[in-house]
Structures are given as C-alpha cells and as structure tokens.
C-alpha cells in the first residue's frame, strides 16, 4: 500500500527536523509506520495475500532497524518519536 503525495507531505511536515528535511530517520519511520498501518488493514480483509504479508514483514524489520539507530544516537528523540507516532504502548 502506497501513500499519496498529500499524505506524504503531511507526514514530512509533522516530523521534519528542519525546513527542507525529507529523509531524516524520523520522517522515514513515520512514513514506514503509516504504510505498515495501511498494509495491516489490507491484510485483515485479504488473509491469503502472502506477497503483501512478506512486504509487511520487511517494512517492520526496516522500521525496527531505524528505531534502534535513533535509540543509540539520541534516546530522547527515540522516546519523543514513539510517543508521537503511537507505537510500543
């Protein structure tokens, strides 16, 4: 499941670090989280879509690696990001 341009722009604006930021780790995690959410909804109704399930697992793994990177570099940013996105309780 892809995000349209307006959704991407909204995510970038809400998570960017500076005015021209489009690829920081925070923005990447926010976009991945949104795509994971959309794909999870898709898989609720299409339980035999194994290719999408595989893509979902890859996205979850990538998000996990990016989050561990943030946690190592700046634990406060990590805490702020997971609260802002609403993952991990």
UniProtKB/Swiss-Prot annotation:
PANTHER family reported in the protein's UniProt record: RIBOSOMAL PROTEIN S15, BACTERIAL AND ORGANELLAR, SMALL RIBOSOMAL SUBUNIT PROTEIN US15M
Disulfide bridge partners, by residue number: none
InterPro entries per record: Ribosomal_uS15, Ribosomal_uS15_bac-type, uS15_NS1_RNA-bd_sf
Function per UniProt: One of the primary rRNA binding proteins, it binds directly to 16S rRNA where it helps nucleate assembly of the platform of the 30S subunit by binding and bridging several RNA helices of the 16S rRNA.
Pfam families given in the database record: Ribosomal_S15
Keyword rRNA-binding on entry: yes
UniProt-recorded Gene Ontology molecular function terms: rRNA binding; structural constituent of ribosome
Name by which UniProt lists this protein: Small ribosomal subunit protein uS15
Keyword list, A-Z: Ribonucleoprotein, Ribosomal protein, RNA-binding, rRNA-binding
Subunit structure: Part of the 30S ribosomal subunit. Forms a bridge to the 50S subunit in the 70S ribosome, contacting the 23S rRNA.
Family: Belongs to the universal ribosomal protein uS15 family.
NCBIfam families assigned to the protein according to its UniProt record, in alphabetical order: S15_bact
Phylogenetic placement of the source organism: Bacteria, Bacillati, Cyanobacteriota, Cyanophyceae, Synechococcales
GO CC aspect terms: cytosolic small ribosomal subunit
């Amino acid at each position: 499941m892809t995000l349209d341009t307006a959704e991407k722009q909204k995510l970038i604006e809400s998570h960017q670090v500076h005015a021209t930021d489009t690829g920081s780790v925070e923005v990447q995690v926010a976009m991945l989280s949104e795509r994971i959410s959309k794909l999870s909804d898709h898989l609720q109704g299409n339980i035999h879509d194994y290719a999408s399930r595989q893509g979902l697992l890859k996205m979850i793994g990538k998000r996990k690696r990016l989050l561990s990177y943030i946690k190592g570099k700046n634990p406060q940013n990590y805490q702020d990001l997971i609260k802002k996105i609403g993952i991990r309780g």
